[in-house]
Amino acid sequence: MKKIRILSLFIFTTILTSGTFGQDLKVNSNGLDIYYRIMGKGLPILIIGGGPGDVSDRYLSLCELLSKDFQCILVDQRGTGKSTPAQIDSSSISLALTIEDFEAIRNHLGFKQWTVLGFSYGGFVAAVYTNDYPTSVSSLIHMGSLGFDFNVYRHFSDNIVSRLHPGDLELLKYWSDSTRMATDKHHAIVETIKARMPGYFFSREKALLVTQTMKDSDFNLSLGDYLWDDMYKRSLELLKKNSDFDKPVLILHGRQDPLGESVAQSLSRYYKNSKLVFVEKSGHYSWIEQPEKILAAIKAFLSPTK
């Protein structure tokens, strides 16, 4: 039994760290080179990762999973990774520019339409993209999406902290100390993210494995300064009425996601043609905890009607 457990953990670690990363490609969008990678063949799926500020490497495992059956396009969003401008300010970082970057990639690749998958914060970005460029999107997938009501952050954070063990809370307190924040704020904040990570997951073992792969360079924490106000304004616009987007929408949500079920249910009501799937025994990072279920759900969603 112990050998089986060790083997399963090895396989899971391989999912997080291995694979063909794809060739670095780029397109110029509004004066900035936006870098992206393509993995797999078939129906194109744009992956919009979370954050704001996550580098695309954090979602390689998702892209690798989908590349078994689809063509996955993974982007270093504006301000992250290789797509970082010389100067980060309101002139170089905005939600509108980020959306235009996606359009630049789609046009460069010659896709009339593509499926858009947004995770967490990326789900909000995907909703804005779909609203602004509905003819560019053939279908939409929300995965652990934040939705549009930012009040969820209150219980999201509470739910995460409520799941932490005493050792996690000690680490959180240690790295939240003002002295450590003053010494190296970026590193300290990343360590607090790592300390909170078990609260995002159903499986503590998998959460701890994820923390082992996390690096300071995985995050550009300054992007929120230039995006949150914009996001709030766009969320109010989106909430004024239900979406006019009438193409298929899949909402994948971990049953144990600390966001709670109401976010996914609200999204399901928001779209005319939506399907809501709760992923059992899964927290926020559903493709890491239940990869087979996620791939099966997406394959069923994107398969042509027979």
Locations of regions flagged by a protein language model:
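Flexible "cap/lid" loop of the alpha/beta hydrolase fold
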Residues: 140-178
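Active-site loop/oxyanion-hole signature of alpha/beta-hydrolase fold enzymes
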Residues: 77-119
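Conserved hydrolase catalytic core segment
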Residues: 112-155
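Conserved alpha/beta-hydrolase "acid-adjacent" motif
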Residues: 258-263
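Catalytic active-site module of serine/aspartate enzymes centered on a nucleophile-bearing elbow/loop
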Residues: 274-306
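Short beta-strand/loop motif that positions the catalytic acidic residue
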Residues: 245, 251-253
